């Protein structure tokens, strides 16, 4: 396993965490100032994994972000024998290293889309990058969807013109609730097992995916920061959040990987919304 690759990827995910948290706190401050409120701040808690490594969970509950969590983790060790065949390259000895960032934002306003993002770097006897970002509006708007996709397309096109259509398709297929026969949101990009034999290029692409998210999502939030919404719209948001819960517990690879590798349960399930209704 390449020690330098581990260090620079882990360092980037920490840096991206700091940039995202700073921007989200800034949005809370902007809103709080106009409403005479005390702005919310992220609360951080560290955790250690018994088999090796650990992470830091950053959680904020505010007036704009009902619940937003930004997790970073770097874990290593051995995957238990019953799960080794599910992780490429771990079949023989089960050794693995994984570092990454995951982010889920649930907004108070039903007019502002929920958002999920993660990027990661994993080493077994093989190595690869994965991740992506997707948007889940409760009241979709075409211009907003186009803007979100355009940010990721620009990041993709810098490296390979085939990336965006391929990763968009993978996102549409991945964030699909098979039991309901419906998509979770309006998509984005999703990639996994990315290894083109050029670590620097694959890492640069993964960094640009993070920068794309940082540029576009705060803009979307700010555009609807002060729009009024109704009790009926909030009720609909709570019901639709149920789809988020269903996907994360039934299909999400990150949830499964975290549980298979004895990750921190609170951090793994951080993506669940703070309030939801099942009718």
Swiss-Prot record:
Which residues does the entry assign to the active site, renumbered to this chain?
Answer: 116
According to UniProt, this protein's pathway is: Porphyrin-containing compound metabolism; protoporphyrin-IX biosynthesis; protoporphyrinogen-IX from coproporphyrinogen-III (O2 route): step 1/1
InterPro entries per UniProt: Coprogen_oxidase_aer (IPR001260), Coprogen_oxidase_aer_sf (IPR036406), Coprogen_oxidase_CS (IPR018375)
Q: Where in the cell is it found?
A: Cytoplasm
Listed name of the protein? Oxygen-dependent coproporphyrinogen-III oxidase
Q: How does it assemble?
A: Homodimer.
Q: What are its E.C. numbers?
A: 1.3.3.3
Specify whether Zinc is a keyword of the entry: no
Q: What does this protein do?
A: Involved in the heme biosynthesis. Catalyzes the aerobic oxidative decarboxylation of propionate groups of rings A and B of coproporphyrinogen-III to yield the vinyl groups in protoporphyrinogen-IX.
Residues given in the record as a divalent metal cation binding sites: 106, 116, 149, 179
Q: Where is this site: Important for dimerization?
A: 179
Cofactor(s) the protein needs? a divalent metal cation
Membership in a protein family = Belongs to the aerobic coproporphyrinogen-III oxidase family.
Q: Name one Pfam family in it.
A: Coprogen_oxidas
* Coarse class of the protein's main subcellular location: cytoplasm
Q: Which GO terms describe its biological process?
A: protoporphyrinogen IX biosynthetic process
Sites binding substrate sit at 102, 118-120
Gene3D superfamilies per the UniProt record, alphabetical: Coproporphyrinogen III oxidase, aerobic
Q: Which reaction does it catalyse?
A: coproporphyrinogen III + O2 + 2 H(+) = protoporphyrinogen IX + 2 CO2 + 2 H2O
- Renumbered to this chain, region (Important for dimerization) spans 244-279
Catalytic EC class: oxidoreductase
């Amino acid at each position: 396993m390449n020690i330098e690759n581990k260090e620079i990827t882990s360092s980037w995910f920490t840096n991206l965490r700091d940039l995202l948290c700073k921007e989200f706190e800034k949005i809370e401050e902007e809103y709080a100032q106009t409403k005479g409120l005390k702005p919310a701040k992220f609360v951080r808690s560290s955790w250690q994994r018994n088999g090796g490594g650990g992470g830091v969970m950053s959680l904020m509950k505010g007036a704009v972000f009902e619940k937003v969590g930004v997790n970073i983790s770097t874990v290593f060790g051995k995957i238990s024998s019953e799960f080794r065949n599910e992780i490429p390259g771990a079949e023989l000895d089960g050794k693995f290293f994984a570092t990454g960032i995951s982010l889920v934002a649930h907004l108070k306003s039903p007019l502002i889309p929920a958002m999920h993002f993660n990027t990661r770097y994993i080493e077994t006897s093989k190595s690869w990058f994965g991740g992506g970002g997707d948007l889940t509006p409760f009241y979709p708007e075409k211009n907003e969807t186009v803007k979100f996709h355009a940010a990721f397309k620009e990041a993709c096109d810098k490296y390979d013109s085939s990336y965006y259509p391929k990763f968009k398709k993978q996102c549409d297929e991945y964030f699909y609730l098979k039991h309901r026969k419906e998509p979770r949101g309006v998509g984005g990009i999703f990639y996994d097992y990315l290894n083109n034999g050029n670590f620097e290029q694959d890492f640069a692409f993964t960094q640009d995916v993070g920068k794309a998210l940082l540029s576009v999502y705060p803009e979307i939030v700010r555009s609807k920061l002060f729009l009024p919404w109704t009790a009926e719209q909030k009720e609909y948001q709570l019901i639709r959040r149920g789809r988020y819960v269903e996907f994360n517990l039934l299909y999400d690879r990150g949830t499964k990987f975290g549980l298979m590798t004895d990750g921190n349960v609170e951090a793994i399930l951080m993506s669940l919304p703070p309030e939801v209704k099942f009718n």
